Amino acid sequence: MKHFDTIVIGGGPAGMMATIASAFYGQQTLLIEKNKRLGKKLAGTGGGRCNVTNNGTLDDLLAGIPGNGRFLYSVFSQFDNHDIIAFFEDNGVKLKVEDHGRVFPKTDKSRTIIQALENKIQELGASILTNTEVVSVKKVDEQFQVKSSDQTFTSDKLIVTTGGKSYPSTGSTGFGHDIARHFKLQVTDLEAAESPLLTDFPHKALQGISLDDVTLSYGKHKITHDLLFTHFGLSGPAALRLSSFVKGGEIAHLDFLPNQSQENLKNYFEENREKSVKNTLKALVPERVAEFLAEDKADSKVKQLHPKDLENIISQLKDMEIPITGKMSLAKSFVTKGGVDLKEINPKTLESKKVPHLHFAGEVLDINAHTGGFNITSALCTGWVAGIQSPWD
C-alpha cells in the first residue's frame, strides 16, 4: 500500500484546488478521479466557456450563494474570488469580466482553466490518478485506507470533493455522501437547485425567445437576470436561480420591463396611440412576445383599444403570471441542494468535527450557489481551505 500525506477524492474544481493547496504546503498528495480526465463537469460550465468566478464584493458573493452561504465567511477570509482571479492570472490565464460580474478566460474555453489547474498540480509534484473509482474508505489506526477495484492507498488526511448528485454522467453520483454516512456524519435531504422550471403556460409560442434583465419572482424572492423560454417552460439564469425557492404548484410573476412603471407605460402607449399595437410593443419586447401579448389586436391602432384591453397588455408586461408545475430532475439540474450537514463541519478548516483530518469541500457540502460563477467560486475556495490544513496536527 502506498502512503500519502493527503488523498483527495474527486477531480472537479474543489478537488483540483485542494490538491494544489495541499501540495503547495508541502504535503505529498494524491488526487483520485473516476473519469478519464479531470474537470469533466467543469468543462461544460458557462456553455463550455467556464465561468470561473464572479468579481463582486463579499456581499455579492454571499447573495449569490443562497444555500448556507454565510457558512463561508471564514473560508472567504482565507481565500476568496479575488484570490481565484489572482491565481489564474499568476498562472498565465488571461481573464475577462462580462455582464453581472461573470469572469471567463479570454480564450472562451473551459479547457484553459482545467489545463492551468492540471499544470499547477504537476508543477507542485502532486500525483494524479484518473480512470480510478474509489469503492471504499475507512480509517484504521489514525490512517485512512482508500480502496479502488485494484489498489489500496493510505493517508494521514482525506479530502472528499466528489460533488453532489446533479449530472451523474459527469461522475457526480453522491459517493461523497456515502463516505460521510460511513463516518456517521449527517447528510441533509438532496434536491434539485439551479434547475430549469416546468410550467403550465402556452410557452410553445415563445419557445426559443431569450430576454435580458427581466424580473422573475415568487413571494419575497425576486431575481432580475436573463430568461429563456423553452419547450418545457423556463430556463436561463433567472429561472435557475428562482428554482431554489420553488418545488411546483407556485405562481411565478414575470416583469418584462422592471425599469418601467405602469404609469410610464400608460404614457408611452398614449404617445404612440397612432401606431399599431404590435409595433408599439415591438419597441419594448421581442417581436414574438409582442405578438403573443397583442393577441388578435396586433394590427389595431393603440387608440382603437378598449381601455380594459390596454390595461391588460400593460398588466401582462409588468406582472405576467406563470404557473410552476415542477423542476427538472436532480440528474438534469446544474446544482445539488443539500449535502453533508454543516453542523458536522468546522467552518474554519472544513474538517469533520467527529473524524480528525477528514475534510469536505465543494458541492458535496450542504452549500448551493447560483450559476454566474458563484458555484465554482464556492468549490475553488473551499478546496483551497481544505487543502492547506495540516495532516500532522
Which residues are covered by each model-predicted region?
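An anion/pyrophosphate-binding glycine-rich loop and adjacent beta-alpha core
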Residues: 36-38, 43-44, 52, 58-59, ...
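Beta1/beta-strand and adjacent pyrophosphate-binding region of the FAD-binding site
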Residues: 2-14
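A conserved short coil-to-beta-strand element within the FAD-binding core of flavoproteins
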Residues: 130-143
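Glycine-rich active-site loop/strand segments that organize a redox cofactor
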Residues: 49-97
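Glycine-rich FAD pyrophosphate-binding loop
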Residues: 7, 23-47
